[in-house]
Amino acid sequence: MYKKIKLRDQQISELINLESKRQNSQIELIASENYASEDVILANGTSLSNKYGEGYPGKRYYGGCTFIDQIEKIAIERVKKLFKIEYANVQPYSGSSANAAVFAALLKPGDKILGLDLNAGGHLSHGYKINFSGMFYSGISYFLDENELLDYDAIEKIALKTKPNLIICGYSAYSRKIDFARFRQIADKVNAFLLADIAHIAGLIAAGQHPSPVGYAHIITSTTQKTLRGPRGGLILTNSKEIAAKIDKVVFPGIQGGPFFHTIAAKAVAFKEALEPWFKEYCAQIVKNASHFASEFIKKGIRIVSQGTENHLFTIDVLSSYNLNGKQAQILLESVNIITNKNTIPNDTLSPFVTSGLRLGTPAMTSRGFKEQEFSQMAEIIDFVLRKKELNALEIKEIKKKVKILTKNFPIKKSYWP
């Protein structure tokens, strides 16, 4: 379990401890959240946060960089080994800033970006109009087919018609495997760069639980906190020396200043953990758990987007299945200490603030040791809560008791830790 901390600032100390208590005592099913190891958290809260060091190892604009240079080099070498790739930049502050760096390095303002429609599982930074990617570049969308799967022939037709400069594959709510080789064929036909945004599935790729984009995508971006279980941060990978040089120039001095060396150290620790044999076992269990979890709902007649999952997440169409919107479902479940997030579904008729879907993921609770049996229990509880719609005081008490037993039996430091 995450330990209590004591600061001189009692107000902040109390709030941090309350948040740690919340994490310890609730079921976490948000697909983009996970539990970093104590080593990662410790590395992220060290004196390294005091150090400034604009530039790259051996080429800094500040003195006193002997040790931070070594740390950044180690992080780079570890992540290159993890993904079997030639070049890596570990300085991006987030996944979105990593994407911004790629766009700035490879595109001109107004160039065309082709990405999955946001409602269908795309991401804001893939060309959505209210995001920088849609403000400074021309965002074009592709969609899922009638089975809610990627239709590569249809994507190719859109690409041939619109001639994008960059095609993005990699999503925030798509539950099926991605054919990176097919995407590269499409990109080559229109002379476009192919960007694989693997923020959600990076850990699964590293562990061999999802096909790798290495060798197909010109460039790869990721976060480090989701299935990789590292600190909050970004990452850029490529096998192209030319692209790597452009990326380095854009990350610094183009869009960022001094790197967060405390975070880079924590990334290095997470990369080392992901290279351990137990991490492959952990990611395999994530996928098993997600498949089993989704199947439990399908058995109950609940509609799952694309009728299943091959990765770590899936989305329930709560509007058609329970006559609830995603916001209502999220609030209901939080009232019994089960944390989820509302999510749009393909062709959603409701706003992103309401949604027709509820996204569920297995990485965090798999970190705590949940296996198929526990996810069967979760499906029973969630289905009961959403069917009832309104819970009385006794029902809330009983469900909270069940959740408490599960969180007590599976504390944060229960399984799959170094």
Swiss-Prot record:
Pathway given for this chain reads:
One-carbon metabolism; tetrahydrofolate interconversion
Which reactions are catalysed by this chain? (6R)-5,10-methylene-5,6,7,8-tetrahydrofolate + glycine + H2O = (6S)-5,6,7,8-tetrahydrofolate + L-serine
Q: In the record, which positions carry N6-(pyridoxal phosphate)lysine? A: K226
Concerning InterPro entries, the annotation shows: PyrdxlP-dep_Trfase (IPR015424), PyrdxlP-dep_Trfase_major (IPR015421), PyrdxlP-dep_Trfase_small (IPR015422), Ser_HO-MeTrfase (IPR001085), Ser_HO-MeTrfase-like (IPR049943), Ser_HO-MeTrfase_PLP_BS (IPR019798), SHMT-like_dom (IPR039429)
GO cellular component terms?
cytosol
Q: Name one GO molecular function term.
A: pyridoxal phosphate binding
EC number(s) per entry: 2.1.2.1
Q: Which NCBIfam families match?
A: PRK00011.1 (NF000586)
Keywords in alphabetical order: Cytoplasm, One-carbon metabolism, Pyridoxal phosphate, Transferase
Stated role: Catalyzes the reversible interconversion of serine and glycine with tetrahydrofolate (THF) serving as the one-carbon carrier. This reaction serves as the major source of one-carbon groups required for the biosynthesis of purines, thymidylate, methionine, and other important biomolecules.
Q: Which CDD domains does the protein's record reference?
A: SHMT
Q: Which family does it belong to?
A: Belongs to the SHMT family.
Naturally occurring in which organism (per UniProt): Mesomycoplasma hyopneumoniae (strain 232)
Domain of life from the UniProt record? Bacteria
Q: Where in the cell is it found?
A: Cytoplasm
Which residues are recorded as binding (6S)-5,6,7,8-tetrahydrofolate? L118, G122, H123, L124, S351, P352, F353
Per its UniProt record, the required cofactor names are:
pyridoxal 5'-phosphate
Recall the taxonomic lineage recorded for the source organism.
Bacteria, Bacillati, Mycoplasmatota, Mycoplasmoidales, Metamycoplasmataceae
HAMAP family from the UniProt entry:
SHMT
What this protein is called in its record is Probable serine hydroxymethyltransferase
Q: Quote the PANTHER family the UniProt record gives.
A: SERINE HYDROXYMETHYLTRANSFERASE (PTHR11680), SERINE HYDROXYMETHYLTRANSFERASE 1 (PTHR11680:SF35)
Gene assigned in the entry: glyA
Single GO BP term: glycine biosynthetic process from serine
Return the PROSITE patterns for the record: SHMT (PS00096)
Q: Give the record's subunit note.
A: Homodimer.
